[in-house]
From Swiss-Prot:
This is 4-aminobutyrate aminotransferase. Substrate binds at R223. NCBIfam families: GABAtrns_euk. SUPFAM superfamilies: PLP-dependent transferases. It holds the Pfam family Aminotran_3. Induction: Up-regulated by GABA and beta-alanine. Is not subject to nitrogen catabolite repression. It comes from Mycosarcoma maydis (Corn smut fungus). The lineage of its organism: Eukaryota, Fungi, Dikarya, Basidiomycota, Ustilaginomycotina. It is found in: Cytoplasm. Its cofactor is pyridoxal 5'-phosphate. Belongs to the class-III pyridoxal-phosphate-dependent aminotransferase family. CDD domains: OAT_like. GO terms for biological process: gamma-aminobutyric acid catabolic process. It catalyses: 4-aminobutanoate + 2-oxoglutarate = succinate semialdehyde + L-glutamate. Its EC number is 2.6.1.19.
Amino acid sequence: MISSKATSAARACARTSRVMQQQQRRLLATVVSSSSLFPGEPSSPHVVTSQIPGPKSKELSDRIGTFQENRTHGFVVDYAKSQGNWIADADGNVLLDMFAQIASIAIGYNNPDLLALAKTDEFITATMNRAALGSFPPTNWQELVETSFGTVKPDGLNNIFTAMCGSCANENAFKASFMAYRARERGEKAEFTPEEMSSCMKNQSPGSPDLSILSFTSAFHGRLFGSLSATRSKAIHKLDIPSFNWPVVEWPDVKYPFAQNSRENAEAEKVALAAVEEAIVSSKKTGSSYGPVAALIVEPIQSEGGDNHASPAFFQGLRDVTKKHGVFMIVDEVQTGVGATGAFWAHSKWNLTSPPDFVTFSKKMQAAGFYHNIETRPSLPYRNYNTWMGDPARTLQARQIIRTIQDHNLIQKTDKVGNYIYEKLFDLIENGAGRGKIEKLRGENAGTFLAFDGRTAKVRDQLIMEMRKLGVHMGGCGDKALRLRPMLVFEQKHADIFLDKLETALGQL
């Protein structure tokens, strides 16, 4: 029988070995480029149809439309032929992908590291024997979580709740915050009362308390009932669906470029912070139209709502206000997380004096969940629970994505490429083909997480379609914004292709 000391020593040795291997790989990373990761990656777009979607794509989409919604389709993709930064469609068009499955692909299509993972016994076992993780975790679950999500824990957060998608990550963070808020009100060791137990079964208080989540205008946090109630980006997302009566505060009315308007932006943020505090304070007063605010949720950059920015000082102000009034702070890093902003977690750039209470993630991680601390773990089992509680196969994928990012210094490279693109776009808007057509460039010092507005929504939409015809796939957000969401393997050579095609497209408008 192996002693606990021997087991601990073996684990320590394994950890040391992994660290040494990682350091060795990082030394090699300085010479690794996307072309070495994807030796067969195209060097330029290849467009064979006059319109995208082309005829084959339209035909396949129409077939899908006979049994499910297809009006949201951009084009139908041939994923087997997509590689690296390039997406291939059913008609044989090959486009430089600046949208990356709505910001969800981190390290390129058909990345060889992920393809190798898919052939391993560990991945096959996890895929073919999907575990109900909350009740029957596999023998390697502890190690798998520690070597994946555990390696990129935000500072100050030591617990991990695994989930299925970004919406349910936020939804379960809401539930955790409500339970922790009520536990604090009751007292640490207080038990549920018979009245609470019976009233919750009728969806009535005190068992189902009238608590609320505070969010911002233009926010997007998902489409489940709780997350949709906190979402404020587009009416079409919310129409006909009953919602919780939760408070909303105006996002700071900032101006771009951000740095050139710092004084006005600081004033706008001050107004928004005052409104946040007023909403929290008034929620606890008799006669309030909504219940006490238990948590505030905020995106580091409002993505779906138009790529709206704020300063680190604003987010520090939110942390100060939430701490002052006993409100939990949830940072929604579903789209900003995993490197695109030039940091693994966008909120790490705020240098908060105390960490947020929850950080949610999904998209580029290819897995989902939230980080928190044991203080916000429910008092009893089965309170924040479902059958799957995540996915071991996707966790294996997340681990490899994290390792590839670290091994090849992809975040540092993304930061550098983002600065290059920003400078070129700034000149294009101020002095080049973009003058009078595109405006409000934003994302300085935010990696490749960049955006700009079309002069009108029509101009933005025309530009997206012209770029497609030229072989670059892009996406919009908000009322008239065009957002850049390339992968972390996007290099300066890809940026030059994008910038060249953008200049051409602008000249055709």
